[in-house]
Every structure is written in C-alpha cells, then in structure tokens.
C-alpha cells in the first residue's frame, strides 16, 4: 500500500484517520497483553499499539515476531494517547494497528540504534549505514542540506553561474600531495584529483563568466586529524572586476543568510577584521578564537635587564595570564603543560603565581626588581597564573597560542553557543618551510601581491604582502581567498621567486601563462570548507560527523575496505608494477 505520510509527521489533527506508515522497529514492549512498538523513520518516532482483541490472530503473531530494525508496513487508526510523551513530536497520538506486513527482517545490530550509544569510531564506520540511522546523525545531514540549499539560492540570486570543473586534472607541485590516477591510454602518465578548482575557476574568469560558484569535491593526500579528510567539499567562488572588500561583502551576506535560515541567528555585519600580524602576536594563531580573552603579551623589554639569562638573552619573552585560576594548577599540571609546550618547539615553560599580593614560583626570585612593573603591565591580582615562553617570536607565539586554547577548554572559558566570525587580512605572501629549506606560498602561487611590496619578489621575500583574506569561525579556518594575478609578467616573477626555472614554470603552468596573453581580467575569489562549516553549526568536533561515508585516520574505509589491492590484469592495463618493501 502507499505510505500515507512519514511516521514522524503524525499529529493530533490526524486523530480518527486511517494511515499506512512504513519504517523500522525501534523498541518493542509487551505490557498486559498489548504490544507497543516504536516505529522509526526519517522524520521521527510513532508509537504503535497492537491489541489482541482488535486484530486477527495472524497479525498478533507477526507483532510478536518483530525485532529491532525489522522493516515493516502498518495500517491503523490514529488515536489520542492516554499518557502523552512530551519528549517527541508525535507524543500526543498513537496508531491502533489493524494490519502489519514485514518488508524485511534484520540481524541483531552490532550496536543499538539510538543517540548517545557508546561504540568505537571504527565500528561506527564499519557499519556506517546503521550509524546513519541514529536521529542525531540524520539531523546533521538535514542541516547540511539546508546549508547547501541556502548557499545555492543566495549565489543564484547574485547571478553566479554554477559550473562543474574537471575531476581529472594536471598534477602541480605546490601544496599538499596529489592523489594520482594513472592513464591507461597514455602509458606512464597520470592525472591528479584536484586539491581545488583554483586554476580552472580562474580560466572561467578569462572566459568571461564573471561570477562562478561550485559546491565541489576536493582531494588532498595529507596527514589527517579531526577537521580534515582526504576528500572534502568546498564552496568555491570566483568573481571578475571586484575588490577584496566587495568579495568579502558577498561572502558575509552568504554566511548571514545561512546562519539565519539554519540556526535562526542574526549575525552582525560587517565581520571584524584583524591583521595577520596582530592575530599571531595577540592570539598566537592565524585562526584566532575570539570567544575568550587571555591574549598573548610581550614582556621582553620588562625582563631585559634581570639576572635570569633564560629571559634576558632570549629573542622575545611572551606571556599569558590565566585569571583567577592559579589554584586549579598544581606543579604536576604545569609539568604536563611544559611537555605540551615542547611539541611546538619551546625549550620549556616558566611560570609564576600571585598569592596574597606576592609573586611565587620558580622564577619569582628573579623578578623582584620588576615585580611592581610586571604586576601593573599584566594587571595581575591574587590567584592569577602567568605562563612565560622565552624563545624565537614564531615559537613563542605558536606555543602560547596552543596553550591558550588548551587552557580555555580545560577551564570552560569558551561560550559554546557563540559564533564569532572574523577576517584575517594583510597576509605575508610567503612562509619559510624548514622542511623544504625555502619560501613557500602562504596560500598559493596565484595570489596577487600588494603593489607596494611586489618589488620584493626579487628581494627579500619575507617582505612581500598578499592581497589575501581568511575567514575564521571560533578558532577554525573556515575559508580563504585572495585577489589573483592576471598579468603574465607578474605571474612569471612569482614562479621565479618560488624557485621555478622558466622551463619548469612553462611545463607546469604553461597553459595558464598563455591564457594571460588573451585579455585576462582582474579577478579574485574564495573557498569555504563546507564540511568544517557544517561541523561547527552542528556543534560537533569532527567532520566525520557531517560526512556520510568518511575515512578513518588512516585514510581508509572500514566498511568497503578501501583502499584495496587490485588485480594483476588491472595493473598490466595501466603499465604499473608494485614493488614490495618487505
């Protein structure tokens, strides 16, 4: 029979109606001869009642045979429940069953299909189709669908064109490792799965499309963590003839629409703007979490003359003040924080506490002469804890920034209901890579340098600034963008600054350079990580919760066993041989 409606949509106005519902058996309870069943479908739970006095014997036998996760079809009359259940939307009604059909049976599931069930991540991924039946998981994907629907409507209304770009592209050397796809037809040649549609969307601007967007899969072969996956989805935008401010205005409007339509929140526009240098110096991060204070403070000048060489001879000494919580941290706790600090390159962690108006702790004896100055500078009061890092500026910032975030979580200083958006602007064009021993693009090699600093492409690369902007939400990089280079000579200078020979640049990017000979317009854009955005909106801490079939931390799928070995015949067709490294 045809389903009348979703089980989760039945309400008091349907009392007296005969309905046919379909779904899964949740709980089954036998009470005084009556059988009660929770019927679950996408929209919720509906209580079924089977009374042996009202149904045929065969219907009762079927009801008694039902087990969790059986798929059933039921027909009956909607009645008012004697005792309403205010915890569910259908709690005022129940279905008095007349007919039951078993559409499919089920083995006992490896875990109970309910929210809050304790089960390992690996088991959840192994039986992902069961994990996704849980209501909280379904809600995550309803939210994701609302977000993408809102984004598409917004961009469509602004005359953006949705264009699909290739999945099989050319491998380029900048950025993370590519996922490579061997070509059967061109022996020894490989496609790459795109890390982003960066170059193709720029070429669409050269084609005169003016405004492009795409909600697109991207691929990066990199080490995984809670907010990364080997394949992920981004909201990709590119525009012609707009300034960075105009692009940011478009993105802010899009996010405001999403927040209103999915969370009912009116965000304040425009978003705050913070320079990269300020973010690093005050928050120790290029993606600062502004939901709490505890800013980094530079005390280098104050401690320069003291008789403590760790401070007086360090390139920089910076501190954070943990207000009113010194008594929460024992020496053992601080030792653990010291080990944590060493993960970021710090040699150690110095500390003091304020007790009864006096500085105490291992280094307090060296601070006697400047105690009053330090107390005023850091605005110290009783029960404050001060943590110092004396090191190179980058190490001090990174270490204290990480400690700041860790301590805020430990002390629950963060307003988890807040959504703090901001732009990080005025980026350096290049970052020094210790691993590579050279400067690398902070974003990518197509970013437009500021006019005032472009001459440093042939000078000190540390001084080149980019017309780039990242959008940050609650300490996460939500997305990044920039104005792009549209002139061939400047793009060639950029490649040269990155260490490309003329031949290498032509081999890797010759098609882009050639396109710049044909009236390439000024352009710029941005990409937002959709998975990360939805994760934050859903209040989750891992993007696996908002991706239907994600990979684990080994970039494998426990359900399908991907990646897997392939046959010798397949390898032969691709002219590939696998070397053993036993």
From Swiss-Prot:
One MF annotation (Gene Ontology) recorded for this entry: catalytic activity, acting on a protein
Annotated S-S bridges: none
Residues annotated to bind L-aspartate: 174, 220, 443, 484
UniProt-annotated stretches for the region Aspartate: 198-201
GO cellular component term, pick one: cytoplasm
Top-level division of the source organism's lineage: Bacteria
Transmembrane regions: none
Record-listed ATP binding positions: 220-222, 229, 477, 529-532
Location of the protein in the cell: Cytoplasm
Pfam assignment, any one: GAD
EC number: 6.1.1.12
GO biological process per UniProt: aspartyl-tRNA aminoacylation
Keywords: Aminoacyl-tRNA synthetase, ATP-binding, Cytoplasm, Ligase, Nucleotide-binding, Protein biosynthesis
First-level EC class: ligase
Keyword Ligase: yes
InterPro entries assigned: Aa-tRNA-synt_II (IPR004364), aa-tRNA-synth_II (IPR006195), aa-tRNA-synth_II/BPL/LPL (IPR045864), Asp-tRNA-ligase_1 (IPR004524), Asp-tRNA-ligase_1_N (IPR047089), Asp/Asn-tRNA-synth_IIb (IPR002312), AspRS_core (IPR047090), GAD-like_sf (IPR004115)
Recorded family membership: Belongs to the class-II aminoacyl-tRNA synthetase family. Type 1 subfamily.
Family matches, as HAMAP family: Asp_tRNA_synth_type1
Record's function text: Catalyzes the attachment of L-aspartate to tRNA(Asp) in a two-step reaction: L-aspartate is first activated by ATP to form Asp-AMP and then transferred to the acceptor end of tRNA(Asp).
Subunit structure: Homodimer.
Protein name: Aspartate--tRNA ligase
Organism name: Streptococcus uberis (strain ATCC BAA-854 / 0140J)
Source lineage: Bacteria, Bacillati, Bacillota, Bacilli, Lactobacillales
């Amino acid at each position: 029979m045809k389903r009348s409606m979703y089980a989760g949509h039945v309400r008091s106005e349907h009392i007296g109606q005969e309905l046919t519902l379909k779904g899964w058996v949740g709980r089954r309870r036998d009470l005084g001869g009556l059988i009660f069943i929770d019927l679950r479908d996408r929209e919720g739970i509906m209580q079924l009642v089977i009374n042996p006095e009202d149904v045929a014997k065969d219907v009762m036998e079927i009801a008694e045979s039902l087990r969790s996760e059986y798929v059933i079809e039921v027909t009956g009359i909607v009645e008012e429940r004697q005792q309403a259940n205010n915890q569910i939307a259908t709690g005022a009604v129940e279905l008095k069953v007349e007919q039951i059909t078993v559409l499919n049976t089920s083995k006992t599931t490896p875990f109970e299909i309910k929210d809050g069930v304790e089960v390992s991540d690996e088991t959840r991924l192994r039986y992902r189709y069961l994990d996704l039946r849980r209501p909280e998981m379904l809600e995550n994907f309803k939210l994701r669908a609302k977000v993408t629907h809102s984004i598409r409507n917004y961009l469509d209304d602004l005359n953006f064109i949705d264009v699909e770009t290739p999945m099989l592209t050319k491998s380029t050397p900048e950025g993370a490792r590519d996922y490579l796809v061997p070509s059967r037809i061109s022996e020894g040649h490989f496609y790459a799965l795109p890390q982003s549609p960066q170059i193709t969307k720029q070429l669409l601007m050269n084609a005169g499309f003016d405004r492009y967007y795409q909600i697109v899969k991207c691929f990066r072969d990199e080490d995984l963590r809670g907010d990364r996956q080997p394949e992920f989805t981004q909201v990709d935008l590119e525009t012609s003839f707009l300034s960075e401010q105009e692009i940011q205005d478009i993105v802010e409007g899009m996010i405001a629409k999403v927040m209103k339509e999915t969370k009912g929140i009116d965000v304040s526009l425009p978003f705050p703007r913070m320079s990269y240098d300020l973010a690093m110096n005050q928050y120790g991060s290029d993606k600062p979490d502004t939901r709490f204070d505890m800013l980094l403070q530079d005390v280098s000048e104050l401690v320069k003359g003291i008789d403590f060489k760790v401070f007086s001879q360090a390139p920089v000494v910076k501190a954070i003040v943990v207000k009113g919580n010194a008594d929460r941290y024992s020496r053992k706790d601080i030792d653990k924080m010291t080990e944590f600090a060493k993960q970021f390159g710090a040699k150690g962690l110095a500390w003091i506490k304020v007790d009864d108006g006096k500085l105490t702790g291992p280094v307090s004896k060296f601070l006697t002469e400047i105690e009053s100055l330090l107390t005023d500078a850091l605005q110290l009061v009783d029960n404050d804890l001060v943590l110092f890092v004396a090191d190179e500026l980058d190490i001090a910032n990174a270490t204290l920034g990480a400690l700041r975030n860790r301590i805020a979580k430990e002390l629950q200083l963060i307003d988890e209901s807040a959504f703090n958006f901001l732009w990080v602007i005025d980026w350096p064009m290049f970052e020094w890579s210790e691993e590579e021993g050279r400067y690398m693009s902070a974003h990518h090699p197509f970013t437009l340098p500021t006019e005032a600093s472009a001459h440093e492409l042939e000078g000190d690369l540390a001084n080149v600034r980019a017309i780039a902007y990242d959008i940050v939400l609650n300490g996460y990089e939500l997305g990044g963008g920039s104005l792009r280079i549209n002139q061939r000579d400047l793009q060639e200078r950029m490649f040269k600054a990155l260490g490309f020979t003329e031949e290498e640049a032509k081999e890797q990017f010759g098609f882009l350079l050639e396109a710049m000979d044909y009236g390439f317009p000024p352009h710029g854009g941005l990409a937002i990580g959709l998975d990360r955005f939805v994760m934050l909106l859903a209040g989750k801490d891992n993007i696996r919760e908002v991706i239907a079939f994600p990979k684990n931390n080994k970039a494998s799928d426990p359900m399908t066993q991907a990646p897997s070995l392939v046959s010798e015949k397949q390898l032969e067709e691709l002219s590939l041989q696998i070397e053993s490294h036993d």
